Amino acid sequence: MRYQVYVVELAKRVFTENAKFRAANPQFNGVLECLYVGMTSKTPKERFTQHKTGYVNKKGHKLSANIVQKYGSYLRPSLYDHINLKAMTRQQALIMEERLALDLRRQGYAVWFN
């Protein structure tokens, strides 16, 4: 199965309203955006729709991240399209999700990832 990473821009109010998000991003100076980085076996667009609709799978598990459901604005393909050109396994996508999130933090973004 092919996996991809994706980036969602979050409303900036997540930084003031969510203490965990704020604590995870002490470097954030308010200049750049707040982002969520994830990985999926779906297309990024399908996954974003799942987040925004509070998708629950057949087993009854909620698959949407609360932070994206509440604060997610839109996908930022310019930040991830170049990574998804190469097919990734689940393990590779998990590693890439963390690398991308930490790289975006170093650039000055406030980032949430799992």
Predicted regions and their residues:
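N-terminal intrinsically disordered, low-complexity tails enriched in polar/charged
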Residues: 1-6, 102, 113-114
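Aromatic/basic micro-patches that form nucleic-acid/chromatin recognition or nuclease catalytic surfaces
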Residues: 42-45, 49, 54-113
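GIY-YIG nuclease catalytic motif and its immediate N-terminal context
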Residues: 1-49, 81-84, 88-91, 95
